[in-house]
Structures are given as structure tokens and as C-alpha cells.
Amino acid sequence: FMEDVYALTKQLDPTRPVSSASGGVLVRTDIWTGHGYEQNPEKFRKIVWNDGKLFTYRSRYYESTGGLYTKNYGFNREAIAGTYDYPEYDGKMPYVFDEYGGIKWTNEEDMKAAANNQGVSWGYGNSPRSLEEFYTRLEGLTDVLLSLSDYICGYCYTQLTDVEQEQNGLYYYDRSEKFDMERIHAVFSKVPENYK
């Protein structure tokens, strides 16, 4: 199905790049994408850049396969990917990290109401305990991707606004500001070292 959608889209407009899926399990694409929501910047870097390869990890069948790594499925796992022989990223097309972050932050009242109830409010990992911890985590995760700018040509923080129970936006559901937007702007305006 995805190969047909890709081909049809290219027939309609061959000048535009086509991404057949966001974040992994790519069948045919012009832009390779990955998702990652690890909240610890050091662990995030190891996930994104594992043994000199973008977003590969040991197969859960690592031992029985003689030490094979999975193909670049992004955040999707083998159980989701099934048995289809998906292509592996070869470094020849743009790699965009199109979802990362997802840091939960909400007002104190909502935080208390949502304790241990993801149906009310959730984000990825543990919520920061302070605004300063939020800024530090956001900058650390973003710096990981910027440090790999020789390999990753773009990134997208998830997400811009809270959506229903997802409390991981940079703005509240009503689009009011959660944070000091000058600090947020400073993080997202950083230029990779090798671009200076």
C-alpha cells in the first residue's frame, strides 16, 4: 500500500520529497525519519547514535541471530514491523528526527490530579520537578541532535501544544504560554558547532 501511495504522490508532483511514514517502518521514502522520547540526554544520544549508526539497537533476537542489529526502524519495534524486509538507512538521503522531547509539564493543580492517572494527563518519562529542570532537559535533548548535524539534517520537537490528555506541549491547550518563550526560542535557535 505505502509503495503505491509513494508512487502516486510522485506522479502527481515529482518535484517534492515524499515521506511514506513518520518515525520508522519506512517502505519507500525520500526522507528518512526517526522518533525518540528518551528523557535523559546521555541515554538519548546512545539510542540515536549507537555504535556509529543512526538509531539502531540490538535486536531482541541478538543472541540467537549471531549478533545482528535491527534495521533502522526508528522507534517502532520488530513486533510492530513484522516480517516485511524493510530498507535500512544507508546515509544517502536526508535524515530528519521528526519527533523528540515530549516533556510533560502542566500546572501544579493538574499535576496533582493526574498523579498515577495517564488517562488524565501524561507525557514521556518523569515530569521535571522544576521549570529549570524542564529547560535543562529540553536543551540537553536538543543539543544531542545538534551535535549530530553531520548526519541529521532536521528535527521537530513534540509537541507545540497540549492535546487532550497529552500534557507535553510548549503551550497549554488554550494556546497560552507555559514557559518563558525567550528561553524556548534560545534553545531552538542554537546553531550546530560545525555550522559556525
Tell where the protein language model's regions lie, with residue ranges.
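Active-site neighborhood of glycoside hydrolase catalytic domains
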Residues: F1-W32, K92
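Residue-level detector of flexible, active-site-proximal loop/helix-junction positions
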Residues: R16, V25, E38-Q39, D162, ...
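Aromatic- and acid-rich polysaccharide-binding/catalytic face
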Residues: A21-R58, M93-I103
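Substrate-binding clefts and catalytic carboxylate motifs of secreted carbohydrate-active enzymes
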Residues: G52-K196
